[in-house]
Amino acid sequence: MKISVIGGGSWGTTLAQVLTDNGHETLIYDVNPEAVKKINNNIHPFFDNKITGIRATLDLKESIDYADYILLAVPTKFMRDSLRDINKLATRKLYFINVSKGIEPVTLKRVSEIVTDEITPELLGAYAVLTGPSHAEEVIERKLTVLTAASDVEWFRKSVQQLFSNQSYLRVYTSDDLIGCEVGGAIKNAIAIVSGMMTGYGLGENARAALITRGILEIVRVVVHYGGKKETAFGLTGIGDLIVTASSYNSRNFNAGLKIGQGTPVEQVLSESKMVVEGVRAIQAAKDLCVQTGIELPIIEITYEVIFNNMSVKEAIQNLLTRELKEEVIA
């Protein structure tokens, strides 16, 4: 099968290598000439790893015409514009596999909804999300990883499962809860930033364990609000993804929070990051959700004040600790 990857970043290039390992043909489209050059010279653009069997192009139309399936690996802030460009050039049905995690601020739309907005109905064949606890740094080293492919279309999620699964390092489960899987993957990035902030500020493992536990409850609230299944938040795409993202120095969101907690200005942290910190947009979107619906997300709401309104980490922690004492309610 032929797969075009839109976005030659760390994750897109790594998944292209997985597909090549599994015997498929892959073509990466990217707007960065240097990234395209590296890929065509068998060099991963972000890691010190050799890649094989992957071709890259600067020509979007070439990548669209080439593909049986299109893998969306661009940051969610660029997703709508990228889809508009794809829609203008497409001449046949498109089958999308999204691997980006985010919710659009203001509109509060998931990536699947943005796809529906921007792709002409006659051209939209099917959509799936591939998500779960995964660092590209480990997958490119072919270390054991387990993901979930979710879609409303049964044959398509099973096709994605077969596409990425192998017997050496990657296993994929399927889910019919597209909403729950998309939302869990987006909101966990916000909690990961908070985890990094607390670690950078000097708090210990006790605090991190509490944060992850309370954070998963905020993920559950958002999943249920969107119409997803509560149970999904306790699987790979929710708590699984949260654990790996909120406790690892390989996580760009955790590392961004870590630097903020250590006192580095937010603007400097974001400008110096080589990769997009998706958790910042997730925090913004979640705050918009709180304002528009009244849903209660205390951890994310107080983190919004740190990121966007210059509240100190010390004050944020104090605000959380001085909230009204309550009985623990699970979900």
UniProtKB/Swiss-Prot annotation:
Primary enzyme class: oxidoreductase
GO biological process entries: carbohydrate metabolic process; glycerol-3-phosphate biosynthetic process; glycerol-3-phosphate catabolic process; glycerophospholipid metabolic process; phospholipid biosynthetic process
GO molecular function, one term: NAD binding
Pfam families: NAD_Gly3P_dh_C, NAD_Gly3P_dh_N
GO cellular component, as recorded: cytosol
Subcellular location: Cytoplasm
Chain sites annotated for binding sn-glycerol 3-phosphate: 101, 132, 134, 188, 241, 251-253
Positions of transmembrane segments: none
Keyword NAD among UniProt keywords: yes
Keywords, alphabetical: Cytoplasm, Lipid biosynthesis, Lipid metabolism, NAD, NADP, Nucleotide-binding, Oxidoreductase, Phospholipid biosynthesis, Phospholipid metabolism
Role: Catalyzes the reduction of the glycolytic intermediate dihydroxyacetone phosphate (DHAP) to sn-glycerol 3-phosphate (G3P), the key precursor for phospholipid synthesis.
PANTHER family xref list: GLYCEROL-3-PHOSPHATE DEHYDROGENASE, GLYCEROL-3-PHOSPHATE DEHYDROGENASE [NAD(+)] 2, CHLOROPLASTIC
Family statement drawn from the similarity comment of this UniProt entry: Belongs to the NAD-dependent glycerol-3-phosphate dehydrogenase family.
Protein's name in the database: Glycerol-3-phosphate dehydrogenase [NAD(P)+]
Protein's gene: gpsA
